[in-house]
Amino acid sequence: MSHSVEDIKSESRRLRGSLEQSLADAVTGALREDDQTLIKYHGSYQQDDRDIRDERRRQKLEPAYQFMIRTRTPGGVITPTQWLALDGIATRYANHSLRITTRQAFQFHGVIKRELKATMQAINATLIDTLAACGDVNRNVQVAANPLLSQAHATLYADAARVSEHLLPNTRAYYEIWLDEERVSGSGSEDEPIYGERYLPRKFKIGFAAPPLNDVDVFANDLGFIAILRDGQLLGYNVSIGGGMGASHGDAETWPRVANVIGFVTREQLLDIATAVVTTQRDFGNRAVRKRARFKYTIDDHGLDTIVAEIARRAGFALQPAQPFAFDHNGDRYGWVEGEDGLWHLTLSLPAGRIADTDTAAHLSGLRAIAQLNVGEFRMTPNQNLVIAGVLASERARVDALVAHYGLDAGNQSATALARGAMACVALPTCGLAMAEAERYLPDFGAALQPLLQQHGLAETPIVLRLSGCPNGCSRPYLAEIALVGKAPGRYNLMLGGDRRGQRLNTLYRENITEPEILAALEPLLARYAAERDHANDEGFGDFLHRAGVIALPPYPTHRRLDLELLA
């Protein structure tokens, strides 16, 4: 018997449910229905291989159930030793691949139920956990990708890690179920001062950005912290609230939203403001209609002023006026970059964040070889790429040799500008929500679009491209200059008009169309862009479409654009 998510949470004994009984049931590869909800809070989703679902049904077999496990790695920072251990876990328990997510976490795919506990224990043995990586809690905290670049970046990362730890659930269920922690008096009734017995109405996302780079797409987060730097010193943070990408096709009651900047806080006020925002959403969020439960809808339903006043009341102080800041782009900086301390940082382009050995590339083996050098650290970016950080100048040649040998940076060195700025969610065959391909389709669509770009002299012009297999928007498609949002197998909504800074939503241009129709719609627009764009100001494709009147932001019940003139 299925129950509402709210009932499942409140009756779960702090996220325990019957997970242990489900895991012990050898008759099926699945969990009990309610436990499929609860395991998300432990960092895992039950999935099945949709490529073979119909065949298994014909054979009267249950679906090929498997589990995705997601790490909690604030800012995506791990050591070479941890990398090697995670590589081993992917090879032993998962599908021989690692995947970098758009929130700087790792995902393991293809873990079967009888090996789920052993996999969880192996991950925790690396001093990485998966607690609260999924579910109606604060998820993995994003951070500007390279905290070693300067002391201010390092402080930013430390602050993000503090927020991540502060917002972890108090329940010991995770440690009891996966790590065999001994149960003590009060087990199942732990106090959850931030979350309460029902946790949050929906998932909650936090990002820390360091201008002028908006690699975290901070305005897509429920709560954003924008570092205010003066003369290299971190003074504090502008606070943004109410971003979110998810929507439902054809449902006027759901929409993506760009966050509002509501003021400035000092570093000392960081945990207080985070707690105030999260608990405001806990108490004001819509628990009756799950599709309307994200913080963005709470703000739109109650009004921004009401929510900001409530946050200030709970924090015990009013936010100061927002400080000036400006972003110039939301991509990654590829190649070697030198930090303030003389250490070097190499950003590698990894298409869709997938790290595997295939017929055309040996990314898993190559990164294993770099990790075995034991130099620097590994830092995942919010654009699904990877930074080899903190490398001595004397060690660069060794890293470069391995990069060349394994073809690790093909995405940067030989691929197109389009590929370097592209992202895609996993979608088929594992995501249960996917309506169309995304990760597996990205290379093919890029190859189909590239001749049009070359035809119009745009082959090396950066264009932000994102593919999503469904309207939930895990790849943050609604901020892209060009986005394909899956509608059905082989059919997509074509969204146009985001910008390179992550500050403006795109809008629907064509609905439910196939690849030939997508290319036919884009060709005349690319031709006009090539002929009429403002070269002097490096005008982006999305900005041009707005200036030329090709598209416009329609009347909309929510926040769609951050006004650039306020941020200079």
Curated annotation (Swiss-Prot):
Alphabetically ordered keywords of this record: 4Fe-4S, Amino-acid biosynthesis, Cysteine biosynthesis, Heme, Iron, Iron-sulfur, Metal-binding, NADP, Oxidoreductase
NCBIfam families cross-referenced by the UniProt entry: CysI, PRK13504.1
This protein's name: Sulfite reductase [NADPH] hemoprotein beta-component
Residue sites binding siroheme per the record: C474
Catalytic activities: hydrogen sulfide + 3 NADP(+) + 3 H2O = sulfite + 3 NADPH + 4 H(+)
PROSITE patterns according to UniProt: NIR_SIR
Function field: Component of the sulfite reductase complex that catalyzes the 6-electron reduction of sulfite to sulfide. This is one of several activities required for the biosynthesis of L-cysteine from sulfate.
Enzyme class: oxidoreductase
Residue sites binding [4Fe-4S] cluster per the record: C425, C431, C470, C474
Cofactor: siroheme; [4Fe-4S] cluster
Pathway: Sulfur metabolism; hydrogen sulfide biosynthesis; hydrogen sulfide from sulfite (NADPH route): step 1/1
GO biological process per UniProt: cysteine biosynthetic process; hydrogen sulfide biosynthetic process; sulfate assimilation
CC per GO annotation: sulfite reductase complex (NADPH)
EC numbers on record: 1.8.1.2
Cofactor note: Binds 1 siroheme per subunit. Binds 1 [4Fe-4S] cluster per subunit.
Pfam families: NIR_SIR (PF01077), NIR_SIR_ferr (PF03460)
Assigned protein family: Belongs to the nitrite and sulfite reductase 4Fe-4S domain family.
PANTHER family: SULFITE REDUCTASE [NADPH] SUBUNIT BETA, SULFITE REDUCTASE [NADPH] SUBUNIT BETA-RELATED
Keyword NAD: no
GO molecular function, one term: sulfite reductase (ferredoxin) activity
InterPro entries named in the record: CysI (IPR011786), NiRdtase/SiRdtase_haem-b_fer (IPR005117), Nit/Sulf_reduc_fer-like_dom_sf (IPR036136), NO2/SO3_Rdtase_4Fe4S_dom (IPR006067), NO2/SO3_Rdtase_4Fe4S_prot (IPR045169), NO2/SO3_Rdtase_4Fe4S_sf (IPR045854), NO2/SO3_Rdtase_FeS/sirohaem_BS (IPR006066)
Assembly with partners or alone: Alpha(8)-beta(8). The alpha component is a flavoprotein, the beta component is a hemoprotein.
